[in-house]
Amino acid sequence: MRQQPHYLELLSPARDAAIAREAILHGADAVYIGGPGFGARHNASNSLRDIADLVPFAHRYGARIFVTLNTILHDDELEPAQRLITDLYNTGVDALIVQDMGILELDIPPIELHASTQCDIRIVEKAKFLADVGFSQIVLARELNLSQIAAIHQATDATIEFFIHGALCVAYSGQCYISHAQTGRSANRGDCSQACRLPYTLKDDQGRVVSYEKHLLSMKDNDQTANLGALIDAGVRSFKIEGRYKDMSYVKNITAHYRQMLDAIIEQRGDLARASVGRTEHFFVPSTEKTFHRGSTDYFVNARKGDIGAFDSPKFIGLPVGEVLNVAKDYLDVEATEPLANGDGLNVLIKREVVGFRANTVEKTGHNRYRVWPNDMPADLHKVRPHHPLNRNLDHNWQQALTKTSSERRVAVDIMLGGWQEQLILTLTSEDGVCITHTLDGVFEEANNSEKALNNLKAGLAKLGQTPYYARDMQVTLPAALFVPNSLLNQFRREAIDMLDAARLAHYQRGRRKPVAQPAPVYPQTHLSFLANVYNHKAREFYHRYGVQLIDAAYEAHQEKGEVPVMITKHCLRFAFNLCPKQAKGNIKSWKATPMQLVHGDEVLTLKFDCRPCEMHVIGKIKNHILKMPQPGSVVASVSPEALMITLPKRRGV
């Protein structure tokens, strides 16, 4: 079910159900969360019970719950995945986010399907194909620019989802195999070893060092705050925040930030609306600078930029807050541009490495000057010279505000009380149009003080503090001001609210899986390499059904034993170091994008440059010991070494 074209959906991540609830309270229109398995985040799974409890909470606000089932599946996992999908459907979740096309060939309920960013959706033809085979919502590649997004939007009937904030994978999503090649941990199965965050030395084709021991594959974090309006104009309707590993404070803060940004656009334009209901009030000032980030970039949305990498450090440095004046044995003196507090996280950069510490005690010693005693004094801190820059990556006082109730979300209710002396009639209508009527029989006398009685009735009916509602409009149409005991009025109101709650949940409609377009679509390629990530026979059947003739096995099947692209990325190190032929002045033909090397310890990777699409291919080879390991997801691979030993036949004489 494609969303209404004027609805804007803020989609937040959740590591667990508690974070999901807070994301919704802070303004999310939808939340994506991992289920018990197959969720592309190895350590971010949740039980069916937790998800089942979360669903009605979300639906009270018209918010949707998407469950990630976006790993590629081994044949041995197809049956368990099919059972899990049925169980998830029965909990009431709104949609599945999937990568493996084999899922579309399984016998599953008619649950709405969303195409994961792992599907590597960069071109119109692929986006249209996915929309035509049954995907209601598609997550586009982060590397696309505004015109590419607009072209896909115009060509498909699927809701366009796009990442607007959070960590950036340097590779096209779904096109990174370096983790599996080096460690046996597959990124396409949610177990990335993050080789992109390691330090590398870059060498040219003559072996000369271009850059030494820098984090050359580590990207800054995505931040599309300034581009929200342009993304809306391009057709984006679901605005996705990355971060299913992020903590509660991060999700609260970033969700609140984008809620306020989108609400301002909605109010300004008038022809747009949020995709869920409720009024959100935040009790803190959101700041994208105060929770984890590696610096900010809008990546390729507008144009290629040179400054997209976090080469110095993949860690969170924070904001500048002053400089170090002196370092003693167990304290340091600093001059600060902002007040410091006990518990602050502070750091300095020494030879491109972050040296951090927690402030145990902070004492003001003069105007903008402080003496700071760390919990543990880092030895490297004594290398710092006077006036060395000081950063803060944990603002203790600001973080404390996020540990408390930091937001409130309530749904508007219009209240009408009518009737007569023998019966009260209470009508509640929620902002999403659900209406209930509740009656209270009795003998209610006219009050001696009609003004006071009327005010008491209104005040009693408006007491909605422990509910997710607030009174937007109040009308009393009784023929006279009647006296109603507070105990009766409170019970009457509570019963009506319970009725409204039940009616709204019953009225909620979740989407269904789209039917396949007729005539049946044809996949835009007839030959699929390992880059298509086909890992099971059901995925093969799917692609054969739609016209693909030759299908290579996924990289995790261990059939690619030679050197292949283990990472394909829009990030180009030639461009970053002004070595791109397109940057050359004069005779461009004299410049060649010759291969380069990335070196980390004993690991040597070759860089090849495809200048027509402006891509860099990282070439590597799977390690021999990984080739001998069981295929990820197979029954053998899922058995512990101890359990596997039990299954082996015993040798004679042992």
What is each residue range found by the language model?
Residues 122-126:
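Short, glycine/polar-rich helix-capping loops at beta-to-alpha or helix-loop-helix junctions
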Residues 1-26, 30-33, 37-40, 54-55, ...:
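Surface-exposed amphipathic alpha-helical tracts and adjacent flexible/coil segments at the periphery
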Residues 43-52:
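Aromatic- and glycine-enriched glycan-recognition loops and surfaces
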Residues 102-109:
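Short active-site loop/helix that positions an aromatic residue
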